[in-house]
């Protein structure tokens, strides 16, 4: 590495440090009604059944798919 490398890198990163970081101004209202335990349980169960169960079945039967000709 040359002696000028740190100076060149400092010059490149110095302009990036001065750029402002834009943040999104996202605000929301409080929920109209609070979710109960049963609502959360039904939501998590439906996500499990719809997404994780079929993918788990395919992964467990992967060897049978490979053996077919």
Swiss-Prot record:
Residues 26-36 are mitochondrial matrix. In response to mitochondrial stress, the precursor protein is ubiquitinated by the SIFI complex in the cytoplasm before mitochondrial import, leading to its degradation. Within the SIFI complex, UBR4 initiates ubiquitin chain that are further elongated or branched by KCMF1. A motif (SIFI-degron) lies at residues 2-19. It comes from the Eukaryota. It is found in: Mitochondrion inner membrane. The keyword Transit peptide applies. CDD domains: Cyt_c_Oxidase_VIII. Residues 61-69 are mitochondrial intermembrane. Pfam families: COX8 (PF02285). Residues 1-25 form a transit peptide. The chain crosses the membrane at residues 37-60. The keyword Nuclease does not apply. Keywords: Membrane, Mitochondrion, Mitochondrion inner membrane, Transit peptide, Transmembrane, Transmembrane helix, Ubl conjugation. Pathway: Energy metabolism; oxidative phosphorylation. Its main location: mitochondrion. It is a single-pass membrane protein. One of its GO terms (cellular component) is respiratory chain complex IV. One of its GO terms (biological process) is mitochondrial electron transport, cytochrome c to oxygen. Component of the cytochrome c oxidase (complex IV, CIV), a multisubunit enzyme composed of 14 subunits. The complex is composed of a catalytic core of 3 subunits MT-CO1, MT-CO2 and MT-CO3, encoded in the mitochondrial DNA, and 11 supernumerary subunits COX4I, COX5A, COX5B, COX6A, COX6B, COX6C, COX7A, COX7B, COX7C, COX8 and NDUFA4, which are encoded in the nuclear genome. Component of the cytochrome c oxidase, the last enzyme in the mitochondrial electron transport chain which drives oxidative phosphorylation. The respiratory chain contains 3 multisubunit complexes succinate dehydrogenase (complex II, CII), ubiquinol-cytochrome c oxidoreductase (cytochrome b-c1 complex, complex III, CIII) and cytochrome c oxidase (complex IV, CIV), that cooperate to transfer electrons derived from NADH and succinate to molecular oxygen, creating an electrochemical gradient over the inner membrane that drives transmembrane transport and the ATP synthase. Belongs to the cytochrome c oxidase VIII family. This is Cytochrome c oxidase subunit 8A, mitochondrial. It comes from Eulemur fulvus fulvus (Brown lemur).
């Amino acid at each position: 590495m040359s002696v000028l490398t740190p100076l060149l890198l400092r010059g490149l990163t110095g302009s990036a440090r001065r750029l402002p970081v834009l943040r999104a101004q996202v605000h929301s209202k409080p929920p109209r009604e609070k979710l109960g335990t049963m609502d959360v349980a039904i939501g998590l169960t439906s996500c499990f059944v719809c997404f994780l169960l079929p993918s788990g079945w395919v992964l467990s039967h992967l060897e049978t798919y490979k053996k077919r000709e």
